Amino acid sequence: MATAVQQKIRERGFLDGQFLIAMPSMFDANFARTVIFVCAHSEDGAMGFVLNRPQRLTFPDVLLHLQLLDPDEVIRLPSAAREFQIQAGGPVETGRGFVLHSDDYLSDSSIPVSDDICLTATLDIVKAISRGEGPLKATMLLGYAGWGPGQLENEISSNGWLTCPAREELIFSRDLDEKYDRALALMGISPAMLSSDAGHA
């Protein structure tokens, strides 16, 4: 389902498994105040997922769209499946779904992206979640964020992003509104400190 993306993920780079935290100078509306989990970084570019943008679609909506569920079957879904969170993962290929999840679930198409986080982009995991047999921790993302060769490095050197090691509890937190401030807190930074320092050498 995502061959090119899978190839990128297999090529480990030094930003793999890192958070990108948007600086106030990030004026691109797609990325303002975002936290991004970098899944792949190499000389060919980078890809990752925005972790704090809501998506209007629900998991039952996705199942209906994929014709994996009849409308009269929604009520019979396990509660965890009905409430399973869908997020907007980025502006690239927004019709494609990806599931970031804990490593207790593995299929032939699951790809490790860090020590304890995997990515699966096939229908197998969607079906497993709908049956209540999916991973303990997971979130579905529609679309992803992508950068060409050298693009992300340039944005970081231009103070567009802060970087820090990713934390599993933040990746899977359902409170999207708090993720940005919590990611900054991992670095000992408050939003007030950032805004007051913006524009100063």
Swiss-Prot record:
Signal peptide span: none
Positions of disulphide bridges: none
Superkingdom of the source species: Bacteria
InterPro entries: AlgH-like (IPR003774)
Gene Ontology CC annotation, any one: cytosol
Pfam families tied to this protein: DUF179
Family: Belongs to the UPF0301 (AlgH) family.
Full protein name: UPF0301 protein NGR_c05390
The organism of origin for this protein: Sinorhizobium fredii (strain NBRC 101917 / NGR234)
Phylogenetic classification of the source organism: Bacteria, Pseudomonadati, Pseudomonadota, Alphaproteobacteria, Hyphomicrobiales
